[in-house]
């Protein structure tokens, strides 16, 4: 039980260091997950994502509101703020161990 509590506390601390004013209701933890193109239709407002681990590739690809003009964003060891309820997005192919944390509101 202590390790789960420590993990939760660590994730909250990580997000609060990045943006102390960002309020979130949910945290998604992914291991080696390559998300297909989608929109977060139930999310409210912006989200933060960070990629962690020993991997190559795995950028966050964000499209315009019409689902066109993809742009890759490097999220490895850095936070990226985006609105996944408006902009379709997906994970680029990657090799290695890739973890991601997504902080969002529902």
Where are these regions (language model features)?
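Non-heme Fe(II)/2-oxoglutarate
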Residues: 1-19
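Catalytic core of non-heme Fe(II) oxygenases with the double-stranded beta-helix
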Residues: 19-93, 97-104
């Amino acid at each position: 039980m202590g390790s789960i509590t420590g993990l939760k506390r660590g994730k909250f601390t990580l997000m609060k260091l990045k943006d102390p004013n960002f309020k979130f209701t949910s945290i998604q933890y992914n291991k080696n997950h390559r998300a297909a193109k989608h929109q977060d239709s139930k999310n409210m407002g912006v989200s933060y994502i960070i990629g962690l681990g020993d991997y190559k590739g795995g950028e966050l690809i964000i499209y315009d509101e019409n689902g066109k003009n993809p742009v890759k964003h490097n999220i490895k060891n850095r936070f990226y703020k985006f609105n996944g309820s408006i902009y379709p997005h997906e994970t680029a192919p990657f090799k290695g161990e890739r973890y991601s944390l997504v902080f969002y509101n529902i």
